[in-house]
Each structure stands twice: as structure tokens, then as C-alpha cells.
């Protein structure tokens, strides 16, 4: 099966609504217009995980949350409409190496490692709506050169080197791959897990206030 359309007339799909398309390696396109499981707002854990040929997905308007690992290792997925999505789970798009752009305009929460290894991403815009991001959201996004945060965002901002900081500037969350040379961590600041992973930074100066 390379393509499937689930119409709005369908009232039940599987017994649990979990992992229905897990590891369907030949599936290229899916259009879902029917409720998923018993929850109309949630795309379950690992729903499309391992669908290595999947290029396009059309989700029902009711879906506002993408479960953990929902699209993990969908290596052919180039883009997905996230309009209306408010929460992205842990590792949701991990290993989606063809995913070239993401629209986070309606997203409030992004889980741990959500876009880990999305090597086709070159730039990401974080809008006002995003107020809660987990650990190492963009870990191993080796080609992510530009990260921009809306001036109106109340939770995050950029530092002078283009790094992602919490709003009060006390924690370094992510340093883009384009960063090179020496980086000085200011007094009173901390660094999140893997904050400098994959960068060209050759030296990090750690202040006395920081424990390693």
C-alpha cells in the first residue's frame, strides 16, 4: 500500500488507535478525515513511526497534539502542515532527515528531542505562542544555521551570538551549528544538556558561578 484515505464516515479504526501505521515502509501518502481512536484531538504515540517512504500527511482539523515519536524516522517526510497543532511530543520528528521546514505558529509546547536529527532544517522561527520547550529540541540538527525568536515571546530570546536562551538570560538552551571559536558563559548562567553539540565552538569559558 502506497496511499490511503481514511474518510470521515469511518467510525472505528483498529482496536486501540495506537501505532496503526507503525513501520509501513512503503506508505507514501496518508489523508485522515476520520476520528483517531477515542480521542479526536490527539495523534497517538508512534502512529507513523518508521514509515520511511512517507512524504505527505493530511491530518484532520481536530488534531491539536502530536504524540511522542509519532513521526520518528519518517526519513522521506519533507513538510507537514502543523497549523492548529498546539503540542508536539517527545521525539515526535526525530530522524526526519528530509523535513526542511516547520511552521510553529500555533504551537505552545515542544517536547524533548522533538526535532532531533532533522538535518534538512536550516532555519527555524519561534513565535510568541511557543512558551514551553523541552530538552535538546534541536539536537543533531547539523545544518540549522539560523534560529529566530519573536520579539513578543515571553519565554525565550536570543543571545548576542544567536544562541537560544530562556527569557531572563540565565540558561543557554541551544547554540546553532554556525557558532564557531570561543564562547564565554557569563556569570550566573547555566547551559542545558547538549547546548553546544554539533557546533564549531572550539573553546568554552566557564564562570566561577557554574558547576560542571
Describe each region flagged by the PLM.
Residues 1-12, 24-42, 52-65, 75-87, ...:
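Structural signature of tandem-repeat unit edges
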Residues 17-22, 44-49, 67-72, 89-94, ...:
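Consensus positions within tandem repeat domains that build extended binding/scaffold surfaces
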Amino acid at each position: 500500500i502506497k496511499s490511503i484515505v481514511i474518510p470521515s464516515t469511518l467510525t472505528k479504526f483498529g482496536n486501540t488507535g495506537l501505532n496503526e501505521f507503525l513501520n509501513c515502509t512503503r506508505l507514501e501518502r496518508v489523508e485522515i478525515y476520520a476520528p483517531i481512536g477515542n480521542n479526536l484531538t490527539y495523534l497517538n504515540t508512534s502512529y507513523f513511526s518508521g514509515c520511511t517512504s512517507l512524504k505527505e500527511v493530511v491530518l484532520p482539523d481536530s488534531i491539536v497534539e502530536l504524540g511522542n515519536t509519532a513521526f520518528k524516522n519518517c526519513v522521506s517526510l519533507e513538510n507537514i502542515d502543523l497549523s492548529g497543532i498546539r503540542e508536539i511530543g517527545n521525539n515526535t520528528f526525530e530522524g526526519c532527515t528530509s523535513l526542511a521546514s516547520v511552521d510553529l505558529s500555533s504551537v505552545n509546547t515542544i517536547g524533548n528531542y522533538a526535532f532531533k536529527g532533522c538535518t534538512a532544517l536550516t532555519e527555524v522561527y519561534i513565535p510568541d505562542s511557543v512558551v514551553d520547550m523541552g530538552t535538546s529540541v534541536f539536537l543533531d540538527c547539523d545544518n540549522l544555521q539560523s534560529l529566530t525568536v519573536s520579539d513578543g515571546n515571553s519565554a525565550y530570546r536570543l543571545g548576542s551570538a544567536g544562541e537560544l536562551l530562556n527569557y531572563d538570560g540565565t540558561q543557554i538552551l541551544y547554540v546553532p551549528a554556525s557558532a564557531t571559536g570561543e564562547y564565554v558563559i557569563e556569570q550566573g548562567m547555566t547551559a542545558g544538556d547538549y547546548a553546544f553539540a554539533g557546533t564549531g565552538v572550539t573553546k568554552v569559558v566557564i564562570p566561577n558561578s557554574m558547576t560542571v
